[in-house]
C-alpha cells in the first residue's frame, strides 16, 4: 500500500509497487517537487539501491535536494532488499529490473519522458546495467 507524506513543500509517495517482467514487485518511493500549481510532468532522477531507499545519507538527502530543484526523484529498493519482493542475488537481475523500472516510470503521467540515474558504488553500477538495455527514456 502506498502512503503519502508532505514535508517542506514536497510530496512523497512511499512504497509504490513496480511490476517486473516476471511478476516480482519492487518498492519505489517517489519525491515530487513543490508544484506551485504546476502538476508536471517533470524530468525524473532514478536511484536504485540495495542499501535501503530511505537511507538518509545517500537517498533521502539527494532526493530532497533534486525535488526542491524541479525533479521527481524515484528511489527503489532492488530485488530482494528491504520493501522489494524477490531474492537478492548481486548483479543478476539489475539489467532487466533496471530497464523495466525505467520503462514503468517513463510511462507515468508525472514523467516528461526524460530519466537520469544517480548514485555511487553499487548504485552507480546498476545505472550502467540499466542503460545498456537501450530504453528510450534514459
Residue ranges and their predicted role:
Residues 1-40:
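N-terminal cap/lid segment of alpha/beta-hydrolase-fold proteins
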Residues 14, 34-107:
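Cap/lid segment of the alpha/beta-hydrolase catalytic domain
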Residues 18, 76, 119:
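Conserved SAM-binding loop
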Residues 23, 80, 119:
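Conserved G/P- and acidic residue-centered "switch" motifs that form tight phosphate/ATP-binding loops
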Residues 47, 103-138:
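Primarily recognizes the serine-hydrolase "nucleophile elbow" in alpha/beta-hydrolase
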